[in-house]
């Protein structure tokens, strides 16, 4: 008998596979991101709420289990930098240009089931350049992925969501280059506004979460954050990270380390 389904496919399969597994009464471990779109994620939440508590689920954000993330959560929730009003999160990765929307047909190998790989995506002829090179290739395309934010944001934004007990935002604003119907943006700055949370006084303030990726995103991040973190932290040395801006100081963290500014903290 099958008890658990592990889903580590390209992102456009995640919601369909997870939903089908839960409907079949199976527990689900799904790699990040949970879904291809926000709409799909909400559908999965509805399915889970209908079937709970008989189904156990987990998303593959393995860094959530590390000592460093747990320690940063303790510092923030314990008031080391005071109430936090802003968190700035970033990844220096960008999205290379997708020059051809629909690639020319190639012979499909006998060992490759192209229709299965396409799954719920729009039909097209086989071409290995759609997937060759792994997720850094197919994740460029809206049909199969959701770009740097969908890929890396799942890991990095997990930290402020956990530390600040965040839920669905009140507002969302995205700034970037002109929208490309085929390819995800090479750079992006996204702002979410969150309401205050009840309970812990260190969480009882509205929070703005800002995401940056790509060259222009990194420039805006550095211009804003370097004066705030001071000489204790050279923000350009952090290719990925999150900076919690509190009333009493700043904590900057990535997967494996954190620093407090001012250092006297």
Show which residues each predicted segment covers.
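Structured segments of extracytoplasmic/periplasmic soluble domains
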Residues: 8, 44-47, 75-78, 90, ...
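Beta-strand-loop-alpha-helix segment that lines the small-molecule cofactor/substrate pocket
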Residues: 10-11, 15-64, 79
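Contiguous beta-strand/loop segments that form the cofactor/metal-binding neighborhood of enzyme cores
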Residues: 70-71, 83, 88-92, 97-265
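N-terminal Rossmann-like NAD(P) cofactor-binding module of classical short-chain dehydrogenase/reductase
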Residues: 3-6
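Alpha-helical packing segments of well-folded alpha/beta enzyme cores
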Residues: 17, 40, 68, 156-159
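Active-site-proximal beta-strand/loop segments in catalytic clefts of secreted hydrolases
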Residues: 8-9, 31-33, 60-62, 90-92, ...
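N-terminal Rossmann-like dinucleotide-binding module
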Residues: 1, 63-66, 76, 160
